[in-house]
Amino acid sequence: MFPIRNTVPTRYPPVITWVLIATNCIAFLFEISLSPYELEQLLYQFALVPARYSEILASDEINPVIDDVLPLFTMMFLHGGWLHLILNMWTLWLFGPTIEDRLGHSRYLAFYLTCGVVASVAHIFFNPVSIVPALGASGAIAGVLGSYMRLFPLARVVVVVPILFIPLFFEVYAFFYVGFWFLMQVLQGMLDLAVTPTRADVAWWAHIGGFVAGFALVPLIVQSERRYRAYYRDEGVLGFDPEGRM
């Protein structure tokens, strides 16, 4: 299933979502302008290398510096290729504006970055000795998906399913589409731990961590019900609950 349309209406321009997409694209254009050696140095400095943090925790003195903390944030603005970038930005473009509309610009930005950091920590926890640089906005975007399912479980998502090279279009409930996506991440993450416990080529647990963070945090920061206009209160058909109750 590939999502092509989010049916939840928005009222305000998704300025922060635009900025995030532009920042990711500019960062990727910078990446591909580098030589292979320069790119390798960039990734090992600003992407997330879990083994680096395992060494810090194993040392007698834990004295984190900015160079150790920065990758928790910067990794979510780096991507490993055009397809990686396009798929992430497409998903952010589909679902980000809805969450930004409900949280407000500043809260949405803080929420997005927090989900990304939690995703980074989850990746380190489940892949502590991996020396493969992890990068991508997937963890933060997973947080957006988690919050979307929490706030709009009955919203319809238009998806395309290719069957024998024939694209078929369906409308499915958000809880089904996002829930299925999350289940696939958990299954892949468990399989990855069983087969390659020391090497994580895909940061499945970053996706899981970001999703759980988004699902859990959004009720705490969403704007209170009394601040919503009738425009929002009429969306009960979508399963919308300002307090994030399921």
Tell where the protein language model's regions lie, with residue ranges.
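A detector for small-residue-rich transmembrane helices and their helix-helix packing motifs
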Residues: 1-246
